[in-house]
Amino acid sequence: MDTVLKEKINLGISACMYGCKVRYNKKGWNMSELFGRDQTSFIWHPVCPESLSGMGIPRSPIRVIGESGKAVLEGNAKIKNREGKDVTDMLIKGCNASIEALERANVFAFVYMEGSPSCGVYRTTLKNNRMGKPPGVFGAMLLDRDFFLIPANDLQSPVRRWDWKRRLYAFAWAKEVDINSKDDLFQFWHIVKFLCQEIDEKTAREIGKRLAELPKGFDKESAETLRHEVMMILRQPSSLEKIKNRLWKHYMYFKRKTGVELENVMEPTDMRNMNHIADELMLMEKTSFSTEVLFGAAPILYRGR
């Protein structure tokens, strides 16, 4: 199986995180620049549900009155602005317009503005509770549609940014790769299993056990179930400790296989800053690709135009 993406990923993003000054107070920040040269690996699709709702810029800040954005969609909560005006219907229409735009572009991943009553997923600003009860209205729609979700604030950390990028590449690959035989299924799992084990070892081990016990023949439905399980795992972030431990483990394998030493790769317990760790990870990616040795922590790379 080819493990190199050649087509750019269509990546949605909260417009205020793409430098568009569309927040209620006319502010915005370009978080996509944090990807550096990698930002050209994506086709960006900025949307702002609040702007598309017709509320304009600047506008009165809004809040959820009730349980959460999901409850708003179910008709059990309201959206009101600072003056107390009910803008529920307007915001839902803006969210629907945003979803329609993303779906037209075949977008399946989204960089969202955390803390927003519209785009927030795990933290929102609700009445009398700054942390709120997530998700926001648009965030609830993204969750319902199984989007690969990236909190914009995480892009400020070079290691977290690397983690999101490698999992997004693997997610995009897993979503589209053909699995039409038992051999395809085993090869698919071999490519992603090390990354899955790092993120969720228990579930990954269970998947491996099920594969080992498969009966003869190929069952397409079972293969698609496994694909979905893998994609659910890949949505979850890893941790710094796991990343460092797996980096060292993969480096030891690479060193034994090639005889090549990489002086910049340090042991998990060695002290260094986030930029150094990110440099180690990218060095392993580059060297593994050039020597055709699988780097299990980042098995899928983008090498398009």
Locate predicted features:
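Short N-terminal binding/cap micro-motifs at the start of the first secondary-structure element
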Residues: 18-26
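Short catalytic helix/loop segments, enriched in acidic residues and glycine
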Residues: 27-45
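Short connector loops at secondary-structure junctions
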Residues: 45-61, 152-162
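Phosphate/nucleotide-donor binding subsite
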Residues: 58-90
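Glycine-rich anion/phosphate-binding loops
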Residues: 83-103
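Internal, conserved structured core segments that host functional sites
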Residues: 98-166
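A conserved mid-domain beta-alpha-beta active-site/ligand-binding segment of alpha/beta enzyme cores
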Residues: 166-223
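Extended non-globular C-terminal regions
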Residues: 221-305
